[in-house]
Regions:
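N-proximal low-complexity "stem/linker" segments adjacent to membrane-targeting elements
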Residues: 1-14
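Conserved catalytic core of nucleotide-sugar-dependent glycosyltransferases
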Residues: 108, 117-118, 126-206, 210, ...
Length: 264
């Protein structure tokens, strides 16, 4: 399994630091990739710029990329990029650009990134219970086009997986998304007009649908709630928790420690 964490240059580094120190602490570092909208290092963790490969010509089509340029300038001048606002507007373009970047890294002869059966995409405030997630993935076939998560029904004809609850792609689905290489307009977005959509999660679902890959929903196991807002009741009482959202800082530490103590 390859864990792919998405963060941003205007996002507090403490969120990633807490995640690395808790729920990601048991994951081998070679199984963790972190992407942002600028390249930097957080401790021993290297963060890749997920937008770096988007051409200057294509960037002109996306008004939000003025923030990307500002982030790079702040970094070059040694200024605090965390003081910039609006990172969520730029984030929608990272979703699919990251999938292309990973595929490129897998294809590079001199790159040590190994092929994995599964790719799990999370935010820095996503909490994942690894034992439960791995149990689910062991029952599924990574050789098939698998697109898994918690459905958002903004468009009844094309539900998309909620990114904050974690999105899982099989290697086969990642390959189908990237092969054959898309060469039309908006290439970093696989031809999807991401600007007109709510988020990169929706754009990803549209790109996958064009390739005949639909979402397999696993709500409430993939869940966008916190422990205090989950709607406990008879319909979900015996469902295992795979993920939760909006958990960071002390809350991330407390939940992780509680689970570790319970397992012990």
């Amino acid at each position: 399994v390859q864990i792919v964490v998405e963060t941003g240059g205007s996002e507090p580094q403490s969120r990633l630091q807490h995640q690395l120190a808790t729920m990601l602490s048991s994951v081998p570092r070679e199984n963790i990739l972190v992407f942002s909208d600028m390249e930097e290092d957080v401790g021993a963790t290297h963060i890749h710029d997920g937008l770096a490969d988007i051409s200057m010509q294509e960037r002109k089509d996306y008004p939000e990329f003025s923030l990307y340029d500002e982030l790079q300038l702040y970094q070059q001048l040694g200024k605090d990029t965390r003081k910039l606002e609006g990172g969520w507007k730029l984030a929608k373009y990272k979703n699919m650009a990251i999938k292309q970047k990973i595929w490129k890294m897998l294809r590079e002869a001199n790159n040590a990134l190994p092929r994995r059966k599964w790719y799990v995409f999370i935010d820095t405030d996503t909490f994942v219970e690894w034992d439960n997630l791995l149990s689910l993935l062991e029952s599924l076939d990574p050789r098939k086009n698998q697109y898994i998560g918690s459905p958002v029904w903004a468009n009844p004809k094309a539900p998309f997986a909620h990114g904050g609850s974690a999105i899982v792609l099989s290697y086969s689905a990642l390959e189908s998304l990237n092969v054959p290489e898309y060469e039309g307009p908006m290439p970093s977005q696989f031809g999807v007009n991401t600007t007109a959509l709510c988020c990169g999660d929706e754009a990803l679902a549209m790109a996958l649908k064009k390739r005949g890959i639909g979402l397999k929903g696993y709500w409430p196991m993939f869940n966008g709630e916190t422990p205090s807002t989950v709607g406990f009741g008879s319909e979900i009482w015996c469902e295992p928790v795979l993920s939760l959202h909006h958990i960071s800082g002390v809350a991330m530490e407390d939940l992780w420690q509680w689970i570790e103590d319970w397992k012990a």
